[in-house]
Amino acid sequence: MREVWATNCFTGGGMGTDIRRVACVGAGLIGQDWATLFSSKGFEVVLQDLSETILEKSMKSVRSNLLFLEASHLLGRGGAEAALKKIRMNRFIGEAVCHADYVQESVPDDYDVKKTVYKEMDAMAPDHAILASSSSGLLMTEIQKVTKKPGRCVLAHPVLPVYLIPLVEIAGGEQTSQETLFAVRDFMKKLGKTPVVLKREVSGYIVNRLQAALLREAIDLVDKDVVSAEDVDKAFCMGIGLRDPMIGPFLRIHLAGEGVERFVENFSQSYRHRWKTMETWTSIPPLAAEKMVRSVREMEVVRKKTLEEIKNWRDQMLVKLLKIIRQG
């Protein structure tokens, strides 16, 4: 198989000093999004999956993503085709990672699956290569146990769509080196991402823990017939969702309380009453799940548009929002 690698590289210090070659292991939704991002930034990419059918489907999605970026003026004219030429497909993990400087793993979130893949990547990738996982909730301390070079293993969890949303959560396991954490942080900045490095591991990291808390309350409101799924989404999008692209929960309470200290003094009691009435279940009750599914299926946008149409509309709105935020 012909090896053609880009001259574009990221230069930092130590591990990850010269990232030219990127491998994406797992070609599902997350893997194809990463491939879109890496190729759009000029890196040569090997996109790997055991299934040739998944690879072919993934490449169609990558092409669509790149054409969208070009149409949105986030890639120059002809940029989509140029980026596509930088991607090769491969069904074998060993062949995909054997020349890589940076590997982004995006296989299913299951410890057994991750460990099997990491063991092979660790054996076949060059010693200097960083092995990053897209896991949305697993702990790297557990995954890296099967590797002989655990210091280079790290979590780099994106938010979909990866090629548009800037955030990347970075977390190390007990044996991950500081050098690896800093190298991934700097590489993500070079890609135009906004990295946040966790001080320590926690299941679900930041975004998914916040989303899990919000989703449980949303499901409970629908289950108790307080409101429909459509109106929950409306309240979010036209309320906190509209306000919070600029501020997070802590800056919000600082503003709402006219100082965070005053917020703690004046609002603690009202929040205590709310928290007392909130659900604490850790798995969705079957009847609540049925109600949620039925209510979501009744939403106007779900009834009238396909998943692909909703995704395209979402991405178009994200581009507009990002342009406004970046203009400051």
Language-model-detected regions and their locations in the chain:
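Hydrophobic packing residues within well-ordered alpha-helices of enzyme cores
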Residues: S58, M121, I143-Q144
